[in-house]
Amino acid sequence: MAQIDFRKKINWHRRYRSPQGVKTEHEILRIFESDRGRIINSPAIRRLQQKTQVFPLERNAAVRTRLTHSMEVQQVGRYIAKEILSRLKELKLLEAYGLDELTGPFESIVEMSCLMHDIGNPPFGHFGEAAINDWFRQRLHPEDAESQPLTDDRCSVAALRLRDGEEPLNELRRKIRQDLCHFEGNAQGIRLVHTLMRMNLTWAQVGGILKYTRPAWWRGETPETHHYLMKKPGYYLSEEAYIARLRKELNLALYSRFPLTWIMEAADDISYCVADLEDAVEKRIFTVEQLYHHLHEAWGQHEKGSLFSLVVENAWEKSRSNSLSRSTEDQFFMYLRVNTLNKLVPYAAQRFIDNLPAIFAGTFNHALLEDASECSDLLKLYKNVAVKHVFSHPDVEQLELQGYRVISGLLEIYRPLLSLSLSDFTELVEKERVKRFPIESRLFHKLSTRHRLAYVEAGSKLPSDSPEFPLWEYYYRCRLLQDYISGMTDLYAWDEYRRLMAVEQ
């Protein structure tokens, strides 16, 4: 196992216009302060205020959006990071681990990773993801990429259909089809930060949001040693070269994770579990009393000193005593949140320290709060009650189905842009208006300048006389639509769908 030295991981250089020379502790901290400014002032963060956490198109400002959730995750991440550093200081290990002059950057990377962790999520959350992937699967049929004979391939896109005698090109076709049918919010976050927003963050800061290490074009089983880390796609084919450079800069082996990402993940797990239940009470899906009974029933028999007793029962009893001039709901969730944090944060911090050799190497194949402990059971309790009583509620399911329909409908509306031939679409991009394509011209005008420029730049890097060019061009054209639609807020997607479907406002 390699020696633990965080100076080899907290890389303050950038992809473009990187600071040069040896830096003092203060200068390095200023570099990460610059990262904070770039992130907090980015449009991608602002858009989170109109993206779903659990309840789509919610007008009640007390119910969480992706932005307020991310701010809560940021605070919990800061708490865990400080707890880890405090414990390492007590153990006199800060200097041994190369952290004595990097405590500020350590905390900042965790905080900003937490704030950014959802920036790639499409409108309507996981149902938006499912809509994008289902729509592309119905046209690209990635499952046919291994079909024999090749005439069985049902892909409706000529450039991506498998052909006899073109094996090198066929392998690229397989990768592209698989990649486009595995849109994922975490992978889109990497694309946003690097390709679309050009935020030029430090290597360490980007490493903090690379939650999953599986490429989106992966086919087959994942290695047992990395099955958790590769549970979902973490980056796209379009960012393959960037991620390869990232691994080199952060000394990460293939499919390994950046150490501070485990802290971001734990902060998210702790935050959303309690928050989803609180939002459900705010939405009147159930009362606090009903929630307590749901939690009690799901946990089962317990001793007086059990974690359930110390966290949930304690919160319930204190809220009923009404010692403060606050509603029972407010008091219950205040105590529940405090009790939960006071138990889970120190536990997550100690898990990080206990498993630091594997975490530093990037190979720890679990979440920090995923084990056989009562702390893990408490998180599972919150999640299970939310799944059973919140996510399955008719109002929630109806809104999710509407969200799925909106995203599917928008993709269908913009489909004419994908139906154009390479030469026709190239002409449209160059002229922006082509008389014989009135619908396509108007659809093209609606695409954002940022996304159009990303498409043009990607194409300009490819030799147009290469046999691979038509494949890559179509890939980036599909990315153009995925980028545009996934970047919408819930409300904008809803309004855009209604406008283009000529539905009454």
Curated annotation (Swiss-Prot):
Its cofactor is Mg(2+). It comes from the Bacteria. GO terms for biological process: dGTP catabolic process. Gene3D superfamilies: Hypothetical protein af1432, putative deoxyguanosinetriphosphate triphosphohydrolase like domain. GO terms for molecular function: dGTPase activity; magnesium ion binding. SUPFAM superfamilies: HD-domain/PDEase-like. Transmembrane segments: none annotated. Keywords: Hydrolase, Magnesium. It is an enzyme of class 3 (hydrolase). Its EC number is 3.1.5.1. Residues 66-273 form the HD domain. It catalyses: dGTP + H2O = 2'-deoxyguanosine + triphosphate + H(+). InterPro entries: dGTP_triP_hydro_central_sf, dGTPase, dGTPase-like, dNTPase_1, HD/PDEase_dom, HD_domain. Homotetramer. Belongs to the dGTPase family. Type 1 subfamily. dGTPase preferentially hydrolyzes dGTP over the other canonical NTPs. PANTHER family: DEOXYGUANOSINETRIPHOSPHATE TRIPHOSPHOHYDROLASE (PTHR11373:SF32), DEOXYNUCLEOSIDE TRIPHOSPHATE TRIPHOSPHOHYDROLASE (PTHR11373). This is Deoxyguanosinetriphosphate triphosphohydrolase.
